[in-house]
């Protein structure tokens, strides 16, 4: 099971990195005019920054859910990956590579024990918290080593946190907002601050 999950994460990461690389060149027309060496460099960059942000986001959900006694596993959505790559040829990416599927614990009679609103909210916010942490980490690195790579990595992670905290289903922000509006607001303001004002 772990081997399948790792395989799904690797495939998802490669597909997302490819989609972002194509979109960042300007889509199909930009891709035609881009040197193969430049594209490979961009792909390597995307693989590092975007895949790291995506994998740690998903593992944040997974680890928190398992801490609450649930079974959690990342499931790849093949259709979402194909859509992401196809849309990248038009210059933009809508990435829906998959999600961590959570199965609740069962009681002695085999009945599922539903997650409380608080636990569900904590599991949901853990992915965004991971991205906020990475954004701060890369921001610190960009101050010490002023490389565009670190600066952009900080912004990408902040953007992922903002996007996932939007309080509409099926995004994580919906469950966080339902659990605790103050915590949702603090997380959202932190992510927006990192993206726009740093």
Residue spans for each PLM region:
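Hydrophobic transmembrane alpha-helices and their immediate loop junctions
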Residues: 1-198
């Amino acid at each position: 099971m772990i081997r399948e999950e790792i395989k799904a994460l690797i495939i998802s990461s490669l597909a997302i990195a490819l989609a972002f690389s194509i979109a960042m060149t300007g889509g199909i027309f930009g891709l035609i005019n881009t040197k193969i060496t430049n594209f490979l460099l961009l792909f390597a960059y995307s693989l590092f920054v975007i895949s790291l942000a995506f994998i740690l986001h998903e593992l944040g959900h997974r680890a928190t859910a398992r801490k609450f006694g649930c079974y959690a596993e990342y499931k790849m959505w093949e259709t979402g990956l194909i859509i992401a790559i196809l849309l990248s040829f038009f210059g933009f990416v809508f990435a829906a590579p998959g999600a961590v599927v959570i199965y609740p614990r069962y009681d002695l009679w085999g009945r599922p024990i539903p997650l409380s609103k608080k636990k569900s909210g904590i599991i949901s916010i853990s992915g965004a918290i991971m991205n906020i942490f990475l954004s701060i980490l890369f921001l610190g690195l960009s101050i010490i080593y002023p490389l565009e790579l670190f600066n952009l990595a900080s912004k990408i992670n902040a953007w992922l946190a903002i996007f996932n905290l939007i309080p509409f289903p099926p995004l994580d922000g919906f469950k966080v907002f339902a659990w605790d509006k103050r915590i949702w607001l603090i997380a959202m303001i932190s992510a927006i601050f990192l993206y726009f004002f740093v």
